[in-house]
């Protein structure tokens, strides 16, 4: 992880990180890692060449639940890049009621702004906590308000009392104490909603900045210290961060590191030129300029999409990538087909990934002080059952594991809370018993 954080990245390092969370799909992981590293290489090029190097956008082909979204999401987390997943079917052609395609860029920019804010908050959090503590202690302490007229002994005595209050505050002993504090009460005038081009859009009119001083009034409130700490800390964090740079840093992150994942791209692939297919083609033509590179107005400024990485995905059961308009196909030079999950893949997903499904359930039962274990035979049976159901009905990939696990563990979730049970093993017989009980029902109906 250190290499990734320091940006000394090579494709093998990226794949090694993805392997911790995603089973199989080696070809897809390899191609997205190359695309990521090439973006890093671009950032090191001279400006005249850098501007000419375009991102190698990717189309992932495969059914649901096999890792398409997770690969892109984990990739963005590794490099702390702004990431958004959108569904192609949610957008409409310009002139129709619905979301316009530029909103995906506006949403990505909002995500980036929040990311930058959180990064800035982390650097000033310690100072903000000290300030928060002092404000609460001052509210609690009823001593003199003018230290200039106090003699040294009085000042020392006051500081001793304050230090005792600080210790109690840090220990949580004062959480239920009620205090009166002054908090900011700003009027929410930063954005307004207007109706334009068949869409509701949020437009920043800058009113918050113009009238901020008028409507930023202080008001007194009585709150328990636990709640007051949250409010005061948020205020102090806002005071300490450099708001002028947030939008600029976020814009740079979006333009150079942003990732937009367009799911269900196959649903807007037009196989003929009539009826709904014409509308779908219209959405494709609206998406095209954004992928090619265009300037999009957001409430944080104009964003250039030329170097955003676009990853599209779809099952392509009823359509083929070649059914997309040729211009859009050309903007996705890399196409990779993800494989359906085997029984062995499902076993590994259950127990080998960093935050595997079994680890999650074991942790949940640990809250009830129950040590839950799964035998290897039980894991094999759960994987086999999931695989067979994916063959017999719609292939949901790893997502079906959740449904199977819930059926197997339903009685435990009901019985364990409040019981004295400390240890329990899920074995093959237990899994078969739970499955047989439910076989009288249509498992394909109940397990999704």
From Swiss-Prot:
The keyword Nucleotide-binding appears for this protein: yes
Cell compartment(s), UniProt: Cytoplasm
Record SUPFAM superfamilies: P-loop containing nucleoside triphosphate hydrolases (SSF52540)
Disulfide partners: none
GO biological process assignments: protein unfolding; proteolysis involved in protein catabolic process
Superkingdom as given in the UniProt entry: Bacteria
A GO CC term attached to the entry: HslUV protease complex
Keywords: ATP-binding, Chaperone, Cytoplasm, Nucleotide-binding
Residue ranges the record marks as coiled coil: none
GO molecular function: ATP binding; ATP hydrolysis activity; peptidase activity; proteasome-activating activity
UniProt binding sites for ATP: 23, 65-70, 263, 327, 399
SMART domains reported for this sequence: AAA, ClpB_D2-small
Chief place of localization: cytoplasm
Protein family according to the UniProt entry: Belongs to the ClpX chaperone family. HslU subfamily.
PANTHER family, A to Z: ATP-DEPENDENT CLP PROTEASE ATP-BINDING SUBUNIT CLPX-LIKE, MITOCHONDRIAL-RELATED (PTHR48102), ATP-DEPENDENT PROTEASE ATPASE SUBUNIT HSLU (PTHR48102:SF3)
HAMAP family: HslU (MF_00249)
Xref: NCBIfam families: hslU, PRK05201.1
Subunit structure as annotated in this protein's UniProt entry: A double ring-shaped homohexamer of HslV is capped on each side by a ring-shaped HslU homohexamer. The assembly of the HslU/HslV complex is dependent on binding of ATP.
Its job: ATPase subunit of a proteasome-like degradation complex; this subunit has chaperone activity. The binding of ATP and its subsequent hydrolysis by HslU are essential for unfolding of protein substrates subsequently hydrolyzed by HslV. HslU recognizes the N-terminal part of its protein substrates and unfolds these before they are guided to HslV for hydrolysis.
Protein name, per record: ATP-dependent protease ATPase subunit HslU
Gene (name only): hslU
């Amino acid at each position: 992880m250190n290499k990734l954080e320091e940006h000394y990245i090579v494709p093998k390092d990226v794949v090694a990180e993805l392997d911790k969370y995603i089973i199989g799909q080696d070809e897809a992981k390899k191609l997205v890692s190359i695309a990521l590293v090439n973006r890093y290489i671009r950032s090191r090029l001279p400006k005249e060449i850098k501007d000419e190097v375009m991102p190698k956008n990717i189309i992932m082909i495969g059914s649901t639940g096999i890792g398409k979204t997770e690969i892109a999401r984990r990739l963005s987390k590794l490099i702390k890049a702004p990431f958004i997943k959108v569904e192609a079917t949610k957008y409409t052609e310009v002139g129709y009621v619905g979301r316009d395609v530029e909103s995906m860029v506006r949403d990505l920019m909002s995500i980036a702004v929040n990311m930058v804010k959180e990064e800035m908050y982390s650097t000033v959090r310690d100072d903000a906590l000290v300030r928060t503590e002092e404000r609460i202690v001052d509210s609690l302490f009823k001593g003199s308000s003018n230290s200039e007229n106090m003699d040294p002994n009085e000042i020392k005595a006051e500081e001793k009392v304050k230090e005792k209050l600080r210790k109690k505050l840090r220990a949580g002993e004062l959480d239920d104490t009620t205090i009166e504090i002054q908090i900011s009460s700003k009027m929410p005038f930063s954005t307004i909603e207007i109706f334009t081009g068949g869409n509701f859009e949020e437009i920043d009119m800058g009113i918050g900045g113009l009238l901020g001083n008028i409507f930023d009034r202080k008001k007194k409130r009585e709150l328990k210290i636990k709640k007051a700490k949250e409010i005061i800390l948020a205020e102090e964090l806002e005071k300490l961060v450099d708001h002028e740079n947030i939008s600029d840093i976020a814009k740079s992150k979006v333009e150079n590191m942003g990732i937009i994942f367009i799911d269900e791209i196959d649903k807007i692939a037009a196989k003929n030129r009539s009826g709904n297919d014409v509308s779908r083609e219209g959405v494709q033509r609206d998406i095209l300029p954004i992928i090619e590179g265009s300037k999009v107005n957001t409430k944080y400024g104009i964003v250039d999409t030329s170097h955003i990485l676009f990853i599209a995905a779809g099952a392509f059961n009823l359509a083929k990538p070649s059914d997309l308009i040729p211009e859009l196909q050309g903007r996705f030079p890399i196409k990779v087909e993800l494989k359906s999950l085997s029984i062995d893949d499902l076993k590994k997903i259950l127990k080998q990934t960093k935050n595997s499904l079994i680890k999650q359930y074991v942790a949940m039962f640990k809250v009830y002080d129950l040590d839950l274990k799964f035998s290897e035979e039980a894991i094999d049976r759960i994987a086999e059952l999931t695989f067979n159901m994916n063959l017999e009905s719609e292939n949901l990939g790893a997502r079906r594991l959740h449904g199977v696990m819930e059926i197997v563990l339903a009685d435990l979730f009901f019985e364990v809370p409040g019981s004295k049970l400390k240890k329990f093993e899920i074995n093959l017989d237990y899994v078969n018993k739970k499955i047989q009980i439910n076989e009288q029902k249509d498992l394909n109906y109940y397990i999704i």
